[in-house]
UniProtKB/Swiss-Prot annotation:
Keyword Phosphoprotein: yes
ZnF segments: UBZ1-type: 653-679
Coiled-coil stretches: 145-205, 232-339, 417-514
One GO term describing the cellular component: cytosol
Stated family: Belongs to the CALCOCO family.
Annotated spans, Interaction with GATA1: 45-125
CDD domains the UniProt entry points to: Zn-C2H2_CALCOCO1 (cd21967)
Organism from which the protein derives: Homo sapiens
Residues with Phosphoserine modification: S4
Subcellular localization(s) per the UniProt record: Cytoplasm; Nucleus
Positions of the UniProt region annotated as p300 KIX-binding: 1-30
Domains: entry comment: The C-terminal activation region (AD) is used for downstream signaling. Seems to be essential for coactivator function with nuclear receptors and with the aryl hydrocarbon receptor.
Encoding gene (name): CALCOCO1
Protein name per Swiss-Prot or TrEMBL: Calcium-binding and coiled-coil domain-containing protein 1
Residues the record lists as binding Zn(2+): C656, C659, H675, H679
Length: 691
């Protein structure tokens, strides 16, 4: 902490010190409560010091403590905290004014408290005056401040307990609301999940419906293609059938032509065979003729010889050869005639071959056409089967589609209803959640208000508790002062008892001297009374015997044998009244000595203390003990006895000098002492009784 003049921070927005008392008791620790404004960041280097009011520098502190840094802070809210100053470091009591000052780590004063003093408590500070709440009476009650503070502390504690119970109830309600919100959120999540699953199912059904629709469209297109193909094939089949019919007609015509050509060829073949048979026969005949010619040549050769012989035969043969030549010519002519037939046959054969080839080609074309027709018919049959299958499948798909449409429409209606129900449920849940969130927000706000009030009440309770502790400390200090005063009174009591013992000794001495003097005077008067007894009767009331005290002592207990005339019970609440004057009974004769007058002075002092009935008697009579009681009661009893009997007699009862209550003479002395102790201030009971 560097030394620097006090730089006062502005009071607005600065540190605010709470419940600063005007006076503090020394030798007791002091608790300082303060509030940091919103936005202030507390630091461990900040400190709170006790300064004199006129201090102008931060180094002029009397003592200081480091500020406490809270663990958790809320942005935008003030910070309440406190520190304690130990009793050993506090200033000494006096009239000097002090104040708390908050100094930050830069050495700037951020706030200061009202001035206060350190001084010992005064006796009157312990009492406070209370007025009646209704104002119906003018009675003022004077009660100890500790009682009032204790009542206020009890009320604050009760209010704090009520607030804590209310806080616990609110926390329980908030917990229930949170659990309800969590259940609703879980239900909403489940509903959303179910809605998502239903939407996924709906999307799956939509996709399957789209796929089925696409497949149906594809099948419809395929069916259209197949129908178009079937129509094309039917047109092709019809065209091919027409072509086949045309080819069949042409083939039939060609067959007829082939048949005619075949018949003609057969005829030609028959003719050719006949011609060939004739040719072969002619050739055979030619060969036979050639052989015969050869034979003839041989025969000619033979016949040359035999020419002559056979010239005729040769002529014949020549004729026969000529005939044969004519036959051969005819055969050749016939062969020549057969050449056109051969050509015609060859042409017919070629035409038959070409017709056969054409028929073969037509047969092949017809076979290919038949195969194409069969193939087309088979393809048509297969197409018809496929179309039938496709139609069956389309019918099945149509039925399935209708069923799917029905089911889909039902599911869609159900899904729409469930979606609507879920939407309504979600809207209700959303409204419920909004309402619950609003209620939770209100509860949080109210809880925050309650927390703020509770914190404020806690701070005020802590401050009141601190004040109560301080008041209790003051009361303890006052109690110590009273104990010291009581010890002083005990010492004074001991001194008074010592003085009473001395006085008792002096009174015994004076009584003995007076008794001796009275005995001497009696003897002298008895001697004189023998001569004039009548004169004694006239002055009988004036004789010293009438005023002579009976034998007494400070520890006298009285003679037994008599019962009380009418004892009364002592009231616990007794008003001290002035007792009957005792001094007339104690007046002695005019011829008492100086010692007698001195004893009378001592007794007069004691009787005056009793007659005053004031605060001095209340304080002194209990300490005087049994000596004064015995003396006072002895005087009373003796005087009354002498008055009634005309001479000294044994007292039959004792009387309280304050309330005139009588006790038997044989009763214990402690009973009278306890009775008289009940009249005075210092007793075993509580000196104050408050309602």
């Amino acid at each position: 902490m560097e030394e620097s003049p006090l730089s006062r921070a502005p009071s607005r927005g600065g540190v605010n010190f709470l419940n600063v008392a005007r006076t503090y008791i020394p030798n007791t620790k002091v608790e300082c409560h303060y509030t940091l404004p919103p936005g202030t960041m507390p630091s461990a280097s900040d400190w709170i010091g006790i300064f004199k009011v006129e201090a102008a520098c931060v180094r002029d502190y009397h003592t200081f403590v480091w500020s406490s840094v809270p663990e958790s802070t809320t942005d935008g809210s003030p910070i309440h905290t406190s520190v304690q100053f130990q009793a050993s470091y506090l200033p000494k009591p006096g009239a000097q004014l002090y104040q708390f000052r908050y100094v930050n780590r830069q050495g700037q004063v951020c706030g200061q408290s009202p001035p206060f003093q350190f001084r010992e408590p005064r006796p009157m500070d312990e009492l406070v005056t209370l007025e009646e709440a209704d104002g119906g009476s003018d009675i003022l009650l004077v009660v100890p401040k500790a009682t009032v503070l204790q009542n206020q502390l009890d009320e604050s504690q009760q209010e704090r307990n009520d607030l804590m119970q209310l806080k616990l109830q609110l926390e329980g309600q908030v917990t229930e609301l949170r659990s309800r919100v969590q259940e609703l959120e879980r239900a909403l999540a489940t509903a959303r999940q179910e809605h998502t699953e239903l939407m996924e199912q709906y999307k799956g059904i939509s996709r399957s419906h789209g796929e089925i629709t696409e497949e149906r469209d594809i099948l419809s297109r395929q069916q259209g293609d197949h129908v178009a193909r079937i129509l094309e094939l039917e047109d092709d089949i019809q065209t091919i059938s027409e072509k086949v019919l045309t080819k069949e007609v042409e083939l039939d015509r060609l067959r007829d032509t082939v048949k005619a050509l075949t018949r003609e060829q057969e005829k030609l073949l028959g003719q050719l065979k006949e011609v060939q048979a004739d040719k072969e026969q002619s050739e055979a005949e030619l060969q036979v003729a050639q052989q015969e010619n050869h034979h003839l040549n041989l025969d000619l050769k033979e016949a040359k010889s035999w020419q002559e012989e056979q010239s005729a035969q040769a002529q014949r043969l020549k004729d026969k050869v000529a005939q044969m030549k004519d036959t051969l010519g005819q055969a050749q002519q016939r062969v020549a005639e057969l050449e056109p037939l051969k050509e015609q046959l060859r042409g017919a054969q070629e035409l038959a071959a070409s017709s056969q080839q054409k028929a073969t080609l037509l047969g092949e074309e017809l076979a290919s056409a038949a195969a194409a027709r069969d193939r087309t018919i088979a393809e048509l049959h297969r197409s018809r089967l496929e179309v039938a299958e496709v139609n069956g499948r389309l019918a099945e798909l149509g039925l399935h589609l209708k069923e799917e449409k029905c089911q889909w429409s039902k599911e869609r209606a159900g899904l729409l209803q469930s979606v609507e129900a879920e939407k309504d449920k979600i809207l209700k849940l959303s409204a419920e959640i909004l309402r619950l969130e609003k209620a939770v927000q209100e509860e949080r706000t109210q809880n925050q208000v309650f927390k703020t009030e509770l914190a404020r009440e806690k701070d005020s309770s802590l401050v009141q508790l601190s004040e109560s502790k301080r008041e209790l400390t003051e009361l303890r200090s006052a109690l110590r002062v009273l104990q010291k005063e009581k010890e002083q009174l005990q010492e004074e009591k001991q001194e008074l008892l010592e003085y009473m013992r001395k006085l008792e000794a002096r009174l015994e001495k004076v009584a003995d001297e007076k008794w001796n003097e009275d005995a001497t005077t009696e003897d002298e008067e008895a001697a004189v009374g023998l001569s004039c007894p009548a004169a004694l009767t006239d002055s009988e009331d004036e004789s010293p015997e009438d005023m002579r005290l009976p034998p007494y002592g400070l520890c006298e207990r009285g003679d037994p044998g008599s019962s009380p005339a009418g004892p009364r019970e002592a009231s616990p609440l007794v008003v001290i009244s002035q007792p009957a004057p005792i001094s007339p009974h104690l007046s002695g004769p005019a011829e008492d000595s100086s010692s007698d007058s001195e004893a009378e002075d001592e007794k007069s002092v004691l009787m005056a203390a009793v007659q005053s009935g004031g605060e001095e008697a209340n304080l002194l009579l209990p300490e005087l003990g049994s000596a004064f009681y015995d003396m006072a009661s002895g005087f009373t009893v003796g005087t009354l006895s002498e008055t009634s009997t005309g001479g000294p007699a044994t007292p039959t009862w004792k009387e309280c000098p304050i309330c005139k209550e009588r006790f038997p003479a044989e009763s214990d002395k402690d009973a009278l002492e306890d009775h008289m102790d009940g009249h005075f201030f210092f007793s075993t009971q509580d000196p104050f009784t408050f309602e």
